[in-house]
Amino acid sequence: MINTFAKENMEKNYWDLPTTYHGPKFDAHTHIWDIKLAEKHLKYAEAFSIQKIMAILDEDVAGKLSPDLHDRFIFARFLRSRNMLSNNSNEMADMVDEYYSQGYSIIKFWFAPRWRDYVESELKIPVDAIKLSSPLFEPIYTRIEDLGLIFLIRNSDPDLWYEKKYQPESKYGSKMTHLQDLEQVLQVHPKMKVLGAHFGAQPEHLENLGRWFDTYPNFYVDASSARWMAREFSQRRSDIISFFEQYSDRILWGTDLSFDGQARSNIPEYYFTRYLTYQVLLETNLQGVPLPFPDPENKSGTNVNGLNLPLEILEKIYWKNAVKFFKRI
């Protein structure tokens, strides 16, 4: 299915791609807004050998999943901004308890700089003093840690966004400040299992990310967002290969694909172009392959330079690491 799509819709570089890894894949970062749409579109994931999926939910809809698919999914619950900012520590901790009682073992925070725009414009709540390390959130971290849950966090965005979107810095803050803010949480809660979305938001800062891995043994990352990973990995190919070799046990593969309205109008292109981008990036030695979907932040155009990772590393990031990481919960 996927190769037929490539031949009919994509440039020749994506046809009959060499495949190093032939085993099952675990997509460790997706979003489900419509669970029945996710069921309907599961065949596209299966075409890329995806057998397990971690899906982030905004509502308690896991129970609506068809019984025969229960073993295919692990679910996380999104902690909504309105609830996070209730200013009632007991309420926030109780919310974690509620999610836990419903069977959720992963709690997601979305704390990228755009968050402050949403909170101020939609919720009409000033956020000048709100940080990840604010005492306001301590009850949440403590409860997550005590219950042995996983904290999934997106705390930052690509460097290019800070240069072009997040201006002035006086309003949004710097990327380094945001990374330091999350590190304070890691320091205070060393036993909390933390999954940093999108390579911990640090594919551009491998030295700092490596230091985090060396310092915080319960910190892991997913390599989700084909656009972001392809752009940044390709620009520092040699360094990222060495990084994967050194930290292959701490990296999970994911896509950040959403089963929602975006996935209704351009099917199966939405899925297959991202999957094949990862295949070129991780499994081949192809160089200078044009990214098959837009990258608005990179005006010069993004080309994918394959890392040609060895099978041992691919086995870990595609499957073994996620199985081991999520088995803890």
Regions found by a protein language model. Give the residues of each.
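Active-site gating/metal-coordination segments in enzymes
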Residues: 59-165, 171-173, 220, 225
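An N-terminally biased module of ancient metal coordination in phosphate/nucleic-acid-related enzymes
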Residues: 1-72, 90, 321
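Acidic (Asp/Glu)-rich catalytic clusters
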Residues: 17-19, 42-47, 62-74, 94-104, ...
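Acidic-and-aromatic substrate-binding clefts and catalytic sites of carbohydrate-active enzymes
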Residues: 31-38, 53-62, 82-91, 117, ...
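Distinct, well-ordered alpha-helical segments
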Residues: 38-39, 65-66, 88, 96, ...
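H/E-rich (His + Asp/Glu) clusters that bind or coordinate divalent metals
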Residues: 3, 9, 35-36, 193-329
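Hydrophobic faces of well-ordered beta-strands that scaffold small-molecule active sites
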Residues: 26-30, 52-55, 74-77, 107-109, ...
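N-terminal/domain-start segments enriched in small and hydrophobic, helix-friendly residues
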Residues: 46-51, 137-173, 177-193, 206-219, ...
